[in-house]
A protein has these predicted regions:
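Extracytosolic ligand-binding ectodomains
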Residues: 2-4, 17, 34-410
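N-terminal secretory signal peptides
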Residues: 1-14, 21-29
Length: 410
């Protein structure tokens, strides 16, 4: 690693070291637990998230969810099966570049004795880092969406969120159900998606669901991540005659798309593909234009307020889905370590496959628990539909878990 220095940051409950390198503002931030009595060796968990670049806010949210649970576990006695061993988070910035993420993963594995790695939000980043962790036989647990993540026969990858194609299909099917419940019939839709692993895979699920329902796709438009003007996309949308639009975008693009739609007085329902559509910055960036925007999501904070309210109190914003998923992932990982009675990566991998993890933060997932099959997919994960209502994100579908009925404007 190019010349680095160690910076010690103190807080009320922990002291953190941040190793700052030349390519990333934050290369590592392990928890260091100090007390007056001997401790069992700490269990090192790698956290590789995009803490800078286009996806930085998502990475920060993921890190916050992980730190929140790690702090709670450490404060209540650590990992019991290992004599109260504390969790030591080794945090690195993946930036938003897959090549950089891969290099950082190699460095982290070389320089630390790790039990597992959590990362890296964006599917393209996770695809890169999981190739490295597979070669090292270290479990990689992720909340990324792309189907390919658990479709490569890697024994060490675990995907807590639904696959993108499942999310895309639910995004479409839930929308049709909501519109029909409101007495509206959709015959034409538009799909616009960023041409990344996430956007491409999710659009595939949307496309197949529309075909199965005999709904005409009158616009099917990929675009490069990081647009600074959505005028052309929205002009095509207006000309298409679509009755609903399904945009798949990260934060900046989602704001451009919805703002341009509303400024051009295009009032058809917009149903986002999670990502940029379900974090507080979306509403902050759009104000009143965010009201009633729908989105698919792997989970939502209002499904587990007894758990998520304390996150809001600490961090000052509602617990977004990526924070919840990473909290549930770390909780499940710690349960696996407890059952394995070992922090050895291979022992943990064996337990993760096929075991059911219940209680704690796993209850915050719509499936009520987490269970990974032999491919590493969480088979209990079920998407939900959320909607922006008065600056809050509310679960509106399916009816069995809805906190309020959806608002539909055809």
């Amino acid at each position: 690693m190019p010349g680095h220095k160690t910076v010690t940051i103190a807080s009320a409950s922990t002291r953190r070291r941040a190793i700052v390198g030349g390519t990333a503002a934050l290369i590592a931030a392990p928890f260091v637990v100090r007390s007056g009595f001997a401790q069992s060796p700490a269990v090192n968990i790698g956290v590789i998230q995009p803490l800078s670049g286009a996806n930085a806010q998502f990475g920060i949210n993921c890190r916050n969810g992980i730190e929140f649970v790690a702090d709670a576990i450490n404060a209540t006695g650590g990992i019991k099966a290992l004599g109260g061993a504390k969790i030591n988070l080794v945090v690195s910035d993946a930036t938003s570049n897959p090549s950089t993420a891969s290099t950082i993963t190699e460095q982290m594995i070389t320089q630390n004795e790790l039990t597992a790695i959590l990362g890296a939000f964006a599917s393209s980043l996770t695809l890169a880092i999981s190739e490295v962790t597979a070669r090292a036989d270290i479990p990689c647990l992720t909340n990324s969406f792309a189907d390919e993540i658990t479709g490569r026969s890697l024994e060490s990858i675990f995907q807590v969120a639904p696959k993108a194609s499942v999310i895309g299909r639910a995004q479409f099917n839930y929308t049709i159900a909501i519109s029909e419940a409101a007495g509206s019939k959709i015959e034409k839709i538009a799909i616009m998606y960023e041409d990344t692993a996430y956007g491409t895979a999710t659009s595939r699920g949307l496309r197949r669901a529309a075909k199965d329902a005999n709904i005409e796709i009158v616009m099917d438009e990929p675009y490069p991540l990081g647009i600074n003007d959505a005028t052309l996309l929205i002009s095509k949308l207006r000309a298409s005659g679509a009755q609903a639009v399904f945009p798949l975008s990260y934060l900046n693009d989602s704001i451009f798309i919805i703002r341009t739609m509303r400024q051009q007085r295009i009032a058809i329902p917009a149903i986002g593909g999670a990502a940029g559509y379900v974090i507080p910055d979306f509403e902050k960036g759009l104000g009143e234009f965010a009201e009633n925007v729908l989105s698919i999501s792997p989970t939502n904070y209002d499904l587990a307020l007894a758990l998520t309210d304390s996150f809001r109190q600490r961090f000052g914003y509602f617990m977004v889905h990526e924070a919840i998923e990473n909290a549930a992932t770390l909780d499940g990982l710690v349960q696996a370590i407890e059952r394995a009675k070992s922090a050895k990566p291979k022992a943990v991998i064996e337990v993760l496959h096929g075991a059911r993890f219940e209680g704690g933060w796993t209850k915050a997932m719509p499936g009520g628990a987490v269970q990974f099959d032999q491919t590493g997919l969480n088979t209990l994960s079920v998407p939900i539909m959320v909607q922006w209502r008065n600056k809050e994100l509310v679960t509106v579908w399916p009816k069995a878990v809805a906190k309020a009925p959806p608002v539909w404007h055809s």
